[in-house]
Each structure stands twice: as structure tokens, then as C-alpha cells.
């Protein structure tokens, strides 16, 4: 059986996947955990009228609250125990990474290996709980004044005000804490990045509903068929663009000087240093979405006029939303790349192994050259991320297309999917298997590339 990823020249051959018991167990474990996540997304928070809440959200089509509900797989619209999703955890991770740059103590922890990373993880967990408490309290307070379009109250709890708020805060915070633990379990015992896969699963389950809803709108003459065709073509183009950009590399040639060790000659080989065009992956849009989701999940449940006016300006496709999103994408693209790559360290390792870039002096000049190339690639990658995430939403608003599954969601789905494929491929190759992708020039080049 062979499954091909469109535009990537990679064909999955699944006969090798289940030959390795450990990989098979990891895949089954990941699927089981994601199934639990989907079950939890249907367990309601006590004291909520589901019918009234559904009617309220149906009236919020196109709002930022509706947009971020997509990342929770509909849990926010149903206000289930997983309504907050993993966004508080992502926000806490962003804060910790920023604080690592600011505070020397945290910077030292990040360089202490596994022990230091464990401490930072503990601090991130604490931060997640704090942010969850704040968001959950804001939602619980806003729910009390919410009503469906027909006037039916959303809250039907017989408890007093603070009793309902306390129960809601505990429920939503516990749900986020459980998802945080689930993500860590996937990292340790499953395959892929746990948090990314949870977001991936939340988006994917909404795809069939979005397609069916779009077809119904065409049948009822609410949108023209040509618009649906344009949306379909645009989605295909975005998928091709994401696959191309996420697999594209810039190769910096590296030459190794000849040297004698004993009676043998070493070196004299040519290789290259591969740098991804988009080295930050899908992290910038996920981080940007998380930051915008934090106030949105609170203001969306508050019916005060001026709060709703601000929330309306943060709708996908609006100028303020697009501007903030682009700024954050550029910031996190450069920030995350700076964390992942250290040009000085790369230059030192290259020099220590007798390698040099033709025409560039080893050491400081090499570090400056690599940093310059990396900066240009990151800038181009940030433009690509911003275009993929923002342009479809702007077009949907301009043509009045009620389709919330935009470029950001497609980018995350395709990016996380490619990352999962690469991790399984690496696992198979590490076990001396042929892998489950056909050999391509890209893979052959990667095998011959410089490893630092």
C-alpha cells in the first residue's frame, strides 16, 4: 500500500511501519491518547445550557472566538472540560522562553542539560495553571450575562454566583492541566510533538463539517458556486506552498582541509550545511494564535458594548488582527530561529573539524556569514508564514465567504503532518530500515550534509 504526499515526491510505504514493535506501540499509544482527547471535548461543564450556548456561538460566525474554537476541536463552543485547549500551556511556554533570555538564572538552567530543562518544564506547568485560572475566571464571569439570540440564559446552574464561578474555574483548569499531561505523555511514549498533535487533531475534526456547511450554503444560494471553487483552488495552492516551503533548504558549501594523522590522510571532502528556508516551522503562527486567543477567550464571553467593539476589531481578516498577527509572526520567527541556531557555535564546530566555507575565513567571519544567510532566510520564511496565514482570511472577508478554515489552520495541519512523517521516517532509518518514503534527491542530500 502506498500513500503519496501531494507535491513532495514522498511516497509512504506502510509495510515497514508496523514491523518494529516499539514504533507500532508508539503509534497505537498516540492514537489512543488523541481518542481520549476527543472524548473529553464532549464532556460538558456543569451548569451550562448547551442549546443556548450553541445558539450563541452560531450567532458568532466569523468572530475571533469562533476562529479559536477551531483549535480546540469545538470544545470552546460547547464549553466542555477542554474548552481552554492547550493555549494556556503555549502562552506559558512563550513567557518562559522570553524570560530565559532576560534572567541569567533561567538562562543557566536552559544550558544545564536534562536537569535544567526539567526545572524549566516545572515552571512552565505552574505558569500554565496560573493562566488557565485567569482565563477560566474571565469566562465564568462572562457566562453569567450571556444569552442566546432568543433570550435564553446560558447559565442554568442553581448554585450561587461564586459557587458556579469556582466550579467552572476548577473544571476548565483541570481540563487544561490534563491536556498538558497528555501532550507530555505523547512526547515520551508516543510519536510526534504532543501539543502540536492535539492542536492538529482539534483542527482536523472540523474539516468535514466546514466542507459540508459550505456545500449547504451553495445549495441554499447563500454563496455562489464560483466562490466555493475559488476557495478550493486557494486551499490546494496553500497546501502546495506549505509543502514546498517546509521542505526547502539553502545549502551552504563546506570544504574540509586535508590533514595527516599517523600514516593516513583525512579530510579533503566536500559537503554542505543545510539551512531550512523556514527554520521556525509552524511555531510562529501557533504562538501568535495563542497570544491572541488569551484575551479573546475572555472578551468573547463579555457582552459589554465597548468590549465587544474591541473584540470585533480582532476578527480574522480585520486590519488590527492582521497587523498584530503579522508583527507577532515576524517576532517569533526570528526569536525561535535565534534559540534553535547559534552561528558562533556552528562556526566553532566547523573550524574544530577542519571545515570551512570557500571564500570565507574560519571563525568569526564564518559566524557572520552564516548569521547573515540565516537572517535572510528567516525574513523570507516570515513573509511566507504571514502570507499563508493572513491572505486567505482577508480574501474570505472581502468576498464574504463564511469559511473559518483559513491559511493558519492549513499551515498547522500540513506542517505538523510533515513533521510527523519525518519523525517516523527518522525512527525507521534509525532502526536500519529502508524508511517509508521513497528515496529522493532531498533525502540523499540530507544524508550527505554536514551534521553539527
Label each PLM-derived region with a short phrase:
Residues 1-7, 12:
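Single conserved hydrophobic/aromatic residue that forms the stacking wall/gate
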Residues 9, 46-87, 149-161, 214, ...:
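Interfacial loop/helix-cap signal at membrane boundaries in integral membrane proteins
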Residues 13, 56-63, 104-105, 251-276, ...:
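Juxtamembrane inter-helical linkers in multi-pass membrane proteins
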Residues 19-35, 118-129, 189-197, 227-232, ...:
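Alpha-helical transmembrane segments and their helix-start/interface "positive-inside/aromatic belt" motifs
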Residues 81-90, 224-241, 321-332:
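Alpha-helical transmembrane segments
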Residues 112-126, 197, 359-376:
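Membrane-interface alpha-helices at helix entry/exit sites of multi-pass transporters
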Residues 242-246, 250, 291, 333-341, ...:
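Membrane-helix cytosolic exit motif
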Residues 271, 275-383, 387:
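Helical hairpin unit composed of two closely spaced alpha helices linked by a short loop
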Amino acid at each position: 500500500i502506498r500513500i503519496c504526499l501531494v507535491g513532495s515526491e514522498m511516497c509512504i510505504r506502510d509495510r515497514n511501519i508496523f514491523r518494529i514493535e516499539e514504533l507500532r506501540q508508539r503509534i497505537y499509544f498516540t492514537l489512543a491518547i488523541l481518542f481520549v482527547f476527543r472524548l473529553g471535548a464532549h464532556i460538558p461543564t456543569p451548569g451550562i445550557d448547551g442549546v443556548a450556548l450553541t445558539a450563541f456561538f452560531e450567532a458568532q460566525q466569523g468572530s475571533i472566538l469562533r476562529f479559536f474554537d477551531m483549535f480546540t476541536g469545538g470544545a470552546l463552543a460547547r464549553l466542555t472540560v477542554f474548552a481552554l485547549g492547550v493555549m494556556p500551556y503555549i502562552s506559558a511556554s512563550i513567557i518562559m522562553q522570553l524570560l530565559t533570555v532576560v534572567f541569567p538564572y533561567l538562562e543557566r538552567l536552559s544550558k544545564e542539560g536534562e536537569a535544567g530543562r526539567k526545572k524549566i518544564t516545572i515552571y512552565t506547568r505552574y505558569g500554565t495553571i496560573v493562566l488557565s485560572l485567569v482565563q477560566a475566571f474571565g469566562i465564568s464571569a462572562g457566562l453569567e450575562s450571556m444569552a442566546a439570540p432568543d433570550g435564553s440564559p446560558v447559565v442554568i446552574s442553581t448554585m450561587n454566583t461564586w459557587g458556579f464561578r469556582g466550579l467552572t474555574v476548577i473544571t476548565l483548569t483541570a481540563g487544561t492541566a490534563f491536556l498538558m499531561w497528555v501532550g507530555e505523555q505523547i512526547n515520551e511514549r508516543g510519536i510526534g510533538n504532543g501539543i502540536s498533535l492535539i492542536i492538529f487533531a482539534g483542527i482536523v475534526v472540523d474539516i468535514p463539517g466546514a466542507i459540508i456547511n459550505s456545500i449547504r450554503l451553495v445549495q441554499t444560494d447563500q454563496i455562489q458556486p464560483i466562490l466555493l471553487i475559488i476557495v478550493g483552488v486557494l486551499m490546494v495552492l496553500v497546501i502546495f506552498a506549505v509543502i514546498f516551503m517546509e521542505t526547502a533548504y539553502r545549502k551552504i558549501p563546506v570544504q574540509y582541509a586535508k590533514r595527516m594523522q599517523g600514516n593516513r590522510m583525512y579530510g579533503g571532502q566536500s559537503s554542505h550545511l543545510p539551512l531550512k528556508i523556514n527554520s521556525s516551522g509552524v511555531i510562529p503562527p501557533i504562538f501568535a494564535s495563542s497570544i491572541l486567543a488569551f484575551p479573546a477567550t475572555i472578551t468573547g464571553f463579555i457582552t459589554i458594548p465597548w468590549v465587544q467593539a474591541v473584540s470585533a476589531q480582532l476578527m480574522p481578516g480585520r486590519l488590527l488582527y492582521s497587523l498584530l498577527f503579522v508583527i507577532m509572526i515576524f517576532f517569533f520567527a526570528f526569536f525561535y530561529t535565534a534559540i534553535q541556531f547559534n552561528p558562533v557555535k556552528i562556526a566553532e564546530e566547523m573550524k574544530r573539524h577542519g571545515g570551512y566555507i570557500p571564500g570565507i575565513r574560519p571563525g568569526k567571519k564564518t559566524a557572520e556569514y552564516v548569521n547573515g544567510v540565516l537572517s535572510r532566510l528567516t525574513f523570507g520564511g516570515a513573509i511566507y508564514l504571514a502570507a499563508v496565514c493572513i491572505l486567505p482570511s482577508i480574501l474570505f472577508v472581502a468576498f464574504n465567504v463564511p469559511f473559518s478554515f483559513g491559511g493558519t489552520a492549513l499551515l498547522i495541519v500540513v506542517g505538523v503532518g510533515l513533521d510527523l512523517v519525518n519523525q517516523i521516517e527518522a525512527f525507521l532509518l534509525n532502526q536500519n530500515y529502508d524508511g517509508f518514503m521513497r528515496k529522493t534527491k532531498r533525502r540523499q542530500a540530507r544524508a550527505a550534509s554536514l551534521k553539527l
